[in-house]
Every structure is written in structure tokens, then in C-alpha cells.
């Protein structure tokens, strides 16, 4: 006898609810269809469902996301870095308390005491006809952030090696839910032939059809749930083995919306708006925001960052603030609207030479006009860099490009060999935006505060009537 086993999954929604009602309708319909046919079917989420960029996620600290997943009927989920490092310890500890699904993450640990009651290292599920399926999940080890919040992520390969033998002996099929990224998924498939399926996320890669690496089929559905993934396994009960593995992703952006989900989203948005309608200050004059010009609010915010982190200098890009603020009452919702990024303050150590190189790079047209999505940045462009504690003099070339002619502190040039503490946004410590910052061996992150918390302090201190 042949038995087909079905998994449907989502990954990296990032609280982008544009297509969520379509996702909900599609998944509920798929599950109902398989139940009618008496076929085994599970719904999975691979992490980063929560992202505090959206007011619903911000107001409810992720709890509304769990409600939405419950409504759809998810069976299993794992933790992404947006759940893991953008919530305070207590908020994450209780995030899944009301989940009607099992949460799996084998390398996630609480260093402040007992593990959350919802946390499972592995889970074993069973098909209608008795096929035992082992589920293991891992999340990306951003321990520089996790440890500041009271968590620890154990090394993925060591963790997998620890549990894989037990799963191999006790189950027929092993499914790995991975919030590690495509490169890690491929390497893990090469190293662990025991894995049958790797369902991925984190790096927002879209695999329209499954990719076979070693013994595993690898799949992932991009970002923001424009696609939903499906895995179909065929088990031969006579031969007692898996004879076929298929993986696909389906574009759901053209499907009809689930009206019940639409109503729930509307209710949550109204309630979130009410919760975020807490007055921060009253402003006598409107606040101007410009991405490519020096503004008072960006200068004051950069000054606050320098003072708050006790750094010698500070630098922030003007693109962090997305919109103006009107005169009158300013609420926390307004602050979230103009600074929605899950970006933390950080301090890096740079030599005088490295700092000057960073400053020169920041004034290039290429960086200022760079359209960026990722590293926590949820805006449009990087914009002009604003500095505190430094005087940066620039001139314009005949082609209109601006270049740095002089950098001083209290009228004196920087010592090229001296190390300085520079406060900035943590987004610059990732990737290649500003290589000198990313390469710095001394980085100190500040959590759970976001830059918008410092913006609120700045407004209270400098702009209140």
C-alpha cells in the first residue's frame, strides 16, 4: 500500500499581512480537503512570522500573530530571529502560551531558569496509517543578541548531531524545519543523510520546486507569504520505505481572501491603534524629516544615541525616519509609524583611520541613495549620515558629487592609530554596507531597546511644549 503524506508551510511573513487572508483561506481549504479524504496533513511555520514593523505585532508583542496562526489551524512552528531577538525576555517567554500548535526548536535555551512550557526539542507525529515522522527545528545563532536577552542558541551542527541518531532509530521519516538560511540548509543536507526533508527560511529564498541535495529535498517559500509551500511524501508500506519526495510552492496572491480572517485583521488593527494611541508629547510646531538633508530631529536623535550609549561619537542615517510629525499630540503609534524598524543601538570600536573611511563612504551617492530591505531596516533609502561629536566638512566636485575634505573633533583631526567608540544602528554591523564597522572586533549591542525608544526620549527632551 502507498500512502501520501502532506505538509503545507509558510516562512518569513514578517507581519506583512497583505496576503494573510489569502494564505489563511488556502491553508484551511487544503487541510479540510485532506481531512475529507482521510489523508495526513500538517501545517507548519518556519519562523519570523512576528515582526514588530507592523502596529498589530507592536501593540500585542506578537500575541496577535499567534492568534492568527491558531485561527488557521497550524500544527507546528519554530522560532525565527524576529521572534527571538526583538522581544523582551518575558514577552518571548510567554509568546506561545496560548498557541494551539507545537513549537519546536532544539537549539533554543533559557539561561535565566526553566525553559518555556511550550518549547520542544523534537516532536514525533504519526500518519493515519502509522508512519512515524520525526520533527526537529533549529534557529540562527545570533548569540551576541540572544545572550543580552537571557537566551542562548547552541551550535546548529552540534545540536543536530545530538538528536539525529535518536530520531533515526525511533522514526521512519525525519523533517527538519530550518531557520538557518539556504547555504546552511544545503551544507546540512550534505552532512546529514538521515534527513529526508528540509523546509527552510531566514534568507528569504524561493524554491518553486524542491532541490535535491544528498538524500534530502530542500524547499522554501520566499518572504511575506506571497507563496505557500507544499511537501508531498509517498510511503510504501509494503517495502517500509519512502519512495518519493516532492516539494512545490504556490503563488497565492491571486486567490480570494478569507473573510473571517479579514474581519479579524480589521479588529486587531483597530485595537492595536487604540493601544498605541498613548501620548508621548505635545509639539508646538511640526517636525520636518528629510532623507538627504541635515535636520534638527536627526541631529538631536544622534546626540541622544551618543549620550545614551556613553560613546565618543555617534552616527545615524536620516533614512531611519520615514515621515514628518505634525504639530500637536504625538503618540507612540506616530513614533512607531515613522520609525518602525527592529533596529537596536550598538557601539563599535574603530581606529581613527577606519572612522574616516566610514565617514567618506557615508557621503557617497551610492550609499545615500541605496535602497535597502533587510538587516532590520524597513525604510526606503539609507539617506544622509548625521554625526554627533564630530565636525565633518565637505565640498562639492564639478560633477555634483559631495566629498569629505576634513574630519575633526573639538577642532583637532582624529588620531589615525587611536581607537574610538562609535555609536550607530546595529544594521551597519551586518553585511557590507560599511565594511569597517562590520569587521570591527569590538561590538556592543543594546537590547531590548529599539532606536524608536531613543526617538521618544529625544522628542520628550527636546521638542515638548
Predicted features and spans:
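Feature captures C-terminal
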Residues: 17, 326-465
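Amphipathic, soluble alpha/beta structural segments
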Residues: 116-132, 151-154, 176-179, 183, ...
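Structural signal for hydrophobic packing residues in well-ordered secondary-structure cores
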Residues: 27-34, 161-164, 168-171, 192, ...
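Residues in well-ordered beta-strands of folded domains
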Residues: 104, 219, 316, 393-395, ...
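Glycine- and acidic
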Residues: 8-11, 285-288, 436-437
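Acidic, metal/ion-coordinating pockets
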Residues: 1-250, 294-298, 304, 445, ...
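A short C-terminal boundary segment appended to hydrolase-like catalytic domains
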Residues: 237-330, 462-464
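A broadly conserved detector of short glycine/acidic/proline-rich loop/turn motifs that flank catalytic sites
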Residues: 137-140, 222-224, 237, 319, ...
